[in-house]
Amino acid sequence: MESISQYAWLIPIFPLAGSLLIGIGLISFRRATNILRWRYSFLIIALLGISLILSCLILFSQINATPSYQWIFQWIVTNNFLLEIGYFVDPLTAVMLVIVTTVAILVLIYTDGYMSYDEGYVRFFAYLSLFTTSMLGLVLSPNLLQIYVFWELVGMCSYLLIGFWFTRPAAADACQKAFVTNRVGDFGLLLGILGFYWMTGSFEFDVISMKLLQLAEYDNFNTQLAIFFGFLIFLGPVAKSAQFPLHVWLPDAMEGPTPISALIHAATMVAAGVFLVARMFPIFSQFPFLMDLIAWTGAITAIIGATIAVTQVDLKKGLAYSTMSQLGYMIMAMGMGSYTASLFHLMTHAYSKALLFLSAGSTIHGMEPIVGFNPAKNQNMSLMGGIRKYMPITGNAFLIGTLSLCGIPPLACFWSKDAILSNAFVHSPLLWFIGWSTAGLTSFYMFRMYFLVFEGEFRGNSVNQEKIRSNKLPKESNTKMTLPLIILTLFSITIGWIGTPFNNQFMFLIHTINQEIEPFDINEFLFIAGSSVGIALLGCYTAYLIYIKDKNTDKFANLLQPFYQLSFNKWYIDDIYEYIFVKGNRQLAQQTLLFDKKIIDGFVNLTGLITLVSSESLRSIENGKIQSYILMIIFTLLTILGISQTYYSLIL
């Protein structure tokens, strides 16, 4: 029987075709391509719309228990090496396809309004389309090697998009920082993939899992080696999903245009790391030590990201640290074995965070005519305030996203966060406490952002680009920007209902890894949900007291000065990296240069000097005068006779 899954290969092909078409147009017919910019954007959106329809059909087929589908082509076949490429569709793939395509198409529609007057409008659409293609290809990959290829393509596209405004020094530095930081994780990922191939002779997930089980039965050394290779693979998600200690690139990535910030943080780059851990879950779950390492990496990242977010002044960077914290939740859940809860939170967070970032972009777009185009001003929350009165759609959308991310029922993230905390309570009370505390901090910093930006009195007319007082006020964004906000608002309200614990339709993912569905316990649910909602409300009320009622933020900062300084300086992690890696490498380079000049060059120059002196000496002897030669012969003979006479006198 024919399955819709066999057409899954078309899903990344459509956006790839659009990206290539624009690329060829920009190279060969730049002027005509820029004139037809609106038609190109419509074409890209239409092509991605076809991919979205196919993704939804595949998801529905998987929900209806359609078997997983795999198509493999043997690309390289030798006596001792086999490389296969193709595509693989299972429930995890189906969910990720829908998340990526829905968020991507809404971001593209939003971009049409946000970037309409940017000179790089067409180029940006080409990059976005290629970025989406790379993530879709990664999701469909049937083996580790193919995942690595698309993994690198995702990294390349992020480099291009973060540095899209490359004339800005900050953007140029940010894309380099993201690229270099991710190289650390990618190098570990590559070594881990090659290590597992060396152990098992395969890049296929199921083959690796089966052979590792067999090897572990014979030799404990194989187990330790497998844990090490698993750790190397985990370095890839640590970097890509901005986990501690390779998280430092993510806030700087905010130098790119806001639509790409939404796509990176919601459905593509950072989601790739969680997806890889999910795909490797049957392998990682064989090693308890590795699972504990994953869980604690996520927990530490969650609390660090949350504590840094509470003092951010830049709106987009505050949301960036929020993403870091929520990704920590997902990785922690994977490490605890909460496969479904982690992926459920990935889905709910994707829509809520896309809503928050696009709302932030709409706010920044409204601030630009007042304070100018400098990100230090139009993203500065201290220059905002009361914007909901002037931009009601944007303000209400941001409020819904905030309520969802804080875990307020019945919005989307409440159900997924509650599922993670419920599993954490059973797995480890300490992990539960970290997750519970992070939930309170999440509520505090999110409502802090909301109150600073959308409530109170507008503070932006006190400064503009020319430092002259302005009486302008923000205006609501155009329909192309507000329509995606409305759609994402609906998703942020309703998408979590498919995973409620008393009617969980999301549990079909469980069958991928053969886990049993635990019965619903109303008492446990009320305790976990009540405690998480309680701490969230406490965080919200604390933010209200400080930023709305009292409005004396200095008193709050002085009261908790050590913690405030630690948070404001981002735990000094960037400073430590600057001192060790940047300044350290610079000092090492200077010392190497000095060694090269004084020692290496000195040795080479000394050799040349010796050659020069000896050649000059020989040249003075070989002067062509016969009397000089006779004199030299006589002198040599006399010297030999003198030595001989001395020798014989000593003997006698």
Curated annotation (Swiss-Prot):
Record keywords, A-Z: Chloroplast, Membrane, NAD, NADP, Plastid, Plastoquinone, Quinone, Thylakoid, Translocase, Transmembrane, Transmembrane helix, Transport
Membrane topology value: Multi-pass membrane protein
A Pfam family reported for this protein in Swiss-Prot or TrEMBL: Proton_antipo_N
Reactions listed under catalytic activity: a plastoquinone + NADH + (n+1) H(+)(in) = a plastoquinol + NAD(+) + n H(+)(out); a plastoquinone + NADPH + (n+1) H(+)(in) = a plastoquinol + NADP(+) + n H(+)(out)
Main location: plastid
GO cellular component terms attached to this protein's record: chloroplast thylakoid membrane
Organism per entry: Mesostigma viride
Oligomeric form and interacting partners: NDH is composed of at least 16 different subunits, 5 of which are encoded in the nucleus.
GO biological process terms held by the UniProt record: ATP synthesis coupled electron transport; electron transport coupled proton transport
Function: NDH shuttles electrons from NAD(P)H:plastoquinone, via FMN and iron-sulfur (Fe-S) centers, to quinones in the photosynthetic chain and possibly in a chloroplast respiratory chain. The immediate electron acceptor for the enzyme in this species is believed to be plastoquinone. Couples the redox reaction to proton translocation, and thus conserves the redox energy in a proton gradient.
Record keyword Translocase present: yes
Family: Belongs to the complex I subunit 5 family.
Residue intervals passing through the bilayer: 9-29, 40-60, 91-111, 124-144, 147-167, 188-208, 225-245, 258-278, 289-309, 327-347, 354-374, 395-415, 424-444, 482-502, 526-546, 630-650
Top-level taxon: Eukaryota
NCBIfam families: NDH_I_L, PRK06590.1
Key word ATP-binding present: no
Subcellular location: Plastid, Chloroplast thylakoid membrane
EC numbers: 7.1.1.-
Class of the enzyme per the UniProt entry, highest EC level: translocase
GO MF entry, a single one: NADH dehydrogenase (ubiquinone) activity
InterPro entries according to UniProt: NADH_UbQ_OxRdtase_chlpt_su5_C (IPR002128), NADHpl_OxRdtase_5_subgr (IPR018393), ND/Mrp_TM (IPR001750), NU5C-like (IPR003945), Proton_antipo_N (IPR001516)
UniProt protein name: NAD(P)H-quinone oxidoreductase subunit 5, chloroplastic
